[in-house]
Amino acid sequence: MASRGINKVILIGYLGQDPDVRYMQNGSAVTNITLATSETWKDKNNGEIKEKTEWHRIVFFNKLAEIAGEYLKKGSQVYIEGSLQTRKWKDQNGIERYITEIIVSVGGTMQMLGSRNSSSLTASSGLSKNNDNLSKQLLSEKKQESFNDSKLQNNNLDFDDEDIPF
């Protein structure tokens, strides 16, 4: 099979607000979240620790949308695998608008991290003959041990910009 490229996004971040769950006319769920990711670095000129936060719009479809809507909330830490998509439309004034989103549908993954009871729930949206069995399996599977939060949050790397090889 010839490959035309790879479109895969992996993020770990925190929800900025509660999920927004909607249903399409055919009854399938669509859930939108905003996810914050941050990086920190030491300013080489003055030694100050700097931080930059990026906000990402994530869109879940079908069973993952239902699971995200039920289990995620503002402040939840989550691992996301999806694909990048940019949409274009014209607003009420005829001006072209663009939005870039991470789409989590077939082949995507969501894993809840950092819960209070040190457990996580993993949900994948793979190709399945019976999506109902998939969702029952995901919701009834044993909860997995979550990542060590200190490893995930230790983004304070001590290096100068000149050390970067590019």
From Swiss-Prot:
Origin superkingdom: Bacteria
A GO molecular function held by the record: single-stranded DNA binding
Disordered, as annotated region: 143-166
GO biological process terms on file: DNA recombination; DNA repair; DNA replication
Keywords: DNA damage, DNA recombination, DNA repair, DNA replication, DNA-binding
UniProt xrefs under InterPro entries: NA-bd_OB-fold, Primosome_PriB/ssb, ssDNA-bd
PANTHER family named in the record: SINGLE-STRANDED DNA-BINDING PROTEIN
Entry function: Plays an important role in DNA replication, recombination and repair. Binds to ssDNA and to an array of partner proteins to recruit them to their sites of action during DNA metabolism.
Domain SSB: residue ranges: 6-111
NCBIfam families named in the record: ssb
Subunit structure as annotated in this protein's UniProt entry: Homotetramer.
Segments carrying motif Important for interaction with partner proteins: 161-166
Keyword Endoplasmic reticulum: no
Name used for this protein in its record: Single-stranded DNA-binding protein
Listed Pfam families: SSB
Matching PROSITE patterns: SSB (PS50935)
One GO CC annotation: nucleoid
